[in-house]
Amino acid sequence: MQRVMPASWSSGGSLLPFRVSTTTKVVLFSLTAGVALMSVLSRFLRRRKPPRPPRRARKYTGRRNRNSMRSPNDLISIAGSKASARSGSPVGSTLAYSDRLSMASGSIGVGVLGVQNAGPGSSVVTQLTAQQLGMMGMEALDTVINFWEDALAAHYSPGGLPALLTTAEDSEFCREIQNLLEMAYTLQEQSELLFLDQRSVLFREEHSIDEAEEEAGEADDDRRSRKSGSVLSRAGSDPNFDSAESFASALDQVADLREFDGFIETSYEEYPLFQSALKHHDEYTVPCRTIRAELMHCSTDTEYLAKLHCVRLAFQFLFKDPAVGQWICDAGRQILTDLLCLGDKDTKEFLVGYEDMVNYLHDSNNWPCIQMELEQRNVKAMTFYDICLDFIILDSFKDLDAPPASVTAVVQNRWLSNGFKETALTTAVWSVLKAKKRMLKFPNGFMSHFYVISEQISPLMAWGFFGPNENLRDICHYFREELLAFLGDIFSFQKSRFTTIEEFSQDVLQHMQTRVNNIGVKFSQ
């Protein structure tokens, strides 16, 4: 052992200031040699370690939540939370971008077009399919829409407070942003049909391969059945026939019956009044301000126009009886008065304005002016349906479905009291109506009287639909549902008799009385 160790170690004093025994020297030498050997082995093994296989990308199995499903009414309330949730750090943006890439580069659609295998230490480059690239574009479009929504919200409330008074330029700017968002939402829906819908060409190419395999399997089964002399069912020959994939592919092969609606001939022999309306439409074309075939549950626009002609004739027939006209006038006054009372509003100014409107309509000398004024607003016929139901009520409901963003910004602001919200909302509605009233061509015409009534009803309806009062909201929604149900009844073959004007008019009046009674019962609860 002394031959192995250096001479200086044997002397025991040249390296250490104290004497070391031989056993201690052997232990120290062994430890040093072991550590050196382990370091050499670890470096060698690390160099020979094979590269780790790339991690498989996550497969995208579900449809993403579309941002365009939100209604335009939620832009102001949601945009703030989006802005706070979105981080500007490089790490956050990198992670978000990698998530989108992993989702888009998964095994979707018809598969990859080509793969380039590189050597160890270099990345694997995968050529993306058309569907994957399209989905990445959809994600980018969703990000763009988020920023545009935040821009709209920031313009309305630059300092966190609602901007109640805006100039004409600001309103025009916000309107253009909303139009831009609407076009972006439409583009989002179209891209979903191209890249996510099961009926897309991208999915049909995949299904064509499955169909070819199924046809080959069917041919083999037929040959087996002819040899054995037994009749085998489709399910018996294919053990995977009831699987989820086969069921999904079978659903894609089922024809959409709605595509053949235009080729189905419906017999209208039992509806003589409707038949005459169809002939009238073929000869003269029924004029219409807005086609509401979907709202009235009509299968085609032609059916809606023919039924619209019947409805106009029915109301003209009903108003020949002064008693019917007086009943409709009294019913409208009672319903609107009850609404104001349920909202704790004073009804005096409303009743004065309502009586002025009734007296104005009863004067036959005013009707040429009324017709001229309404024709400028594209009202095609001077009937109760066209003026009251279509032009006033249905358009008002449409405005309530898409209120101005300034209104939603005030109502949905959690830092404002309910009293201040209601006052601000009423002031905003009054200012808009007064501005419209000043621009009227006929200062004392029909629209002027209508705006007087709207100054009392519109703030209440807006507060009822968007305010925090649950009872008032329930009443307003019930009022709208009953009116829409009444319109659906008079346009229905099952609820109304399109046989003669007399019978159809009787059904229309009966439906109106039923809905008025329902509203009265609801308001009295």
Curated annotation (Swiss-Prot):
GO terms for molecular function: phosphatidylinositol 3-kinase activator activity. GO terms for cellular component: mitochondrial outer membrane; mitochondrion. Residues 47-73, 210-239 are annotated as: Disordered. Residues 47-67 have a biased composition (Basic residues). It is found in: Mitochondrion outer membrane. The chain crosses the membrane at residues 26-45. Interacts with zuc. Belongs to the mitoguardin family. Regulator of mitochondrial fusion required to maintain neuronal homeostasis. This is Mitoguardin. The gene is Miga.
